[in-house]
Amino acid sequence: MFKFALALTLCLAGASLSLAQHNPQWWGNRNTIVHLFEWKWSDIAGECETFLAPRGFAGVQVSPVNENIIAAGRPWWERYQPISYKLTTRSGNEEEFADMVRRCNDVGIRIYVDVLLNHMSGDFDGVAVGTAGTEAEPSKKSFPGVPHTAQDFHPSCEITDWNDRFQVQECELVGLKDLNQHSDYVRSKLIEFLDHLIELGVAGFRVDAAKHMAAEDLEYIYGSLSNLNIEHGFPHNARPFIFQEVIDHGHETVSREEYNQLGAVTEFRFSEEIGRAFRGNNALKWLQSWGTDWGFLNSEQALTFVDNHDNQRDHGSVLNYKSPRQYKMATAFHLAYPYGISRVMSSFAFDDHDTPPPQDAQENIISPEFDEDGACVNGWICEHRWRQIYAMVGFKNAVRDTELSGWWDNGDNQISFCRGNKGFLAVNNNLYDLSQELNTCLPAGEYCDVISGSLIDGACTGKSVTVNEYGYGYIHIGSDDFDGVLALHVNAKV
């Protein structure tokens, strides 16, 4: 009986930890993460204070923080080739990182670090030098900055069969030296690295290439981490939020279901299907059943996004900033529909897969610059600063904890729906106008469309909709309007 009780206690403790690792530890009524891809720490700190907090964002995913290899031309992917766990990159040093985390936490913006637990750098001719000046010989699996030697890695092999679990989890992903996470020593170095970030005040981690590591090894590592730092405003016994990169199209040997109990999982099917729909390759009417009926993970397990830093560079159905009208519609739907843990992308302009972030002649990352409307102008795209996107972050906050109701569609690519009696969204992806009375579910009054403008000094700078005593309002979205979406919520009532 004692053994059974002990086993049950351990089982419940493990379940409690994994459930806690699905909690993003957001402040109050905030619920959207933004990925400030390749931004400097000092710029993120300022963005938290001057833009993200006032606009109601909940957190920032930052690029990898630990020392990486220096690659010719400084492509973005060099950040994903670590050579030590020193906190020095082109985004800044440890002091600047710690300052950014503190300043963001102080205004209610949580920080989530993109971490590389699967591998170290790939092959490099001769001795490689990292962003902190550390030398390494990746071809010999020698990384003195950790230190790691060949005994800390799986034997070298290529992934040629993605249906072979051994190859997927023990061979080298695109030539990156594959760490052996079953080793006590390797585990200890990874836990030490993550715990240091927790000590500095981060709220959690995006785990790169999670499917290339055995779930039981990750479970051990996650379960060994410290609780979040209460000096940064986290409650006692709070666990780091974990979201794991697991690409699973439904026929993978290593599946997302192996990881979704350990933390949230990146729902790539969401990204692909939302892109397909808003590109016009699937009627929007079918989105009424969006979510698990589409084969997606349960809402609390799914990290959702229209695009990410990887798949925005691929061809196919995924939308990115280069199709702005469709991208804004898809993002509005993403943030309005009650499914998933939402993350929006903030990119820099690219012409090819390897384009580096905006940099000066000395290859230093440059700070974003803004025009009079607050949009970025010097190579940074900053989708999160597009009014149509940050306004929907406010919409998502306004409708939190409400259900989907009042669905309407025209049998094709015009849809609308309510979020309780707090918000209303309409979308027109047809080549003809949407013009009719629709149920907004809102209390009677005049509301500003937060897509086309804002509520300023009691007046709308864009469209407005008058809602009658029955909750109906006249909705017009022209086929040639600048935006194909309209959004109303209770915090934008005149």
Swiss-Prot record:
Family annotation (InterPro entries): A-amylase/branching_C, A-amylase_C, Alpha_amylase, Glyco_hydro_13_cat_dom, Glyco_hydro_b, Glycoside_hydrolase_SF
SMART domains (alphabetical): Aamy, Aamy_C
First and last residue of the signal peptide: 1-20
Residues reported to bind Ca(2+): N118, Q169, D178, H212
Gene3D superfamilies (UniProt xref): Glycosidases (3.20.20.80), Golgi alpha-mannosidase II (2.60.40.1180)
Keyword entries, A-Z: Calcium, Carbohydrate metabolism, Chloride, Disulfide bond, Glycosidase, Hydrolase, Metal-binding, Pyrrolidone carboxylic acid, Secreted, Signal
GO MF term set: alpha-amylase activity; metal ion binding
Modified residues (Pyrrolidone carboxylic acid): Q21
Top-level EC class as recorded in UniProt: hydrolase
Residues engaged in binding chloride: R206, N308, R343
The enzyme's E.C. designation: 3.2.1.1
Protein name (database record): Alpha-amylase-related protein
Originating organism: Drosophila punjabiensis
The gene coding this protein: Amyrel
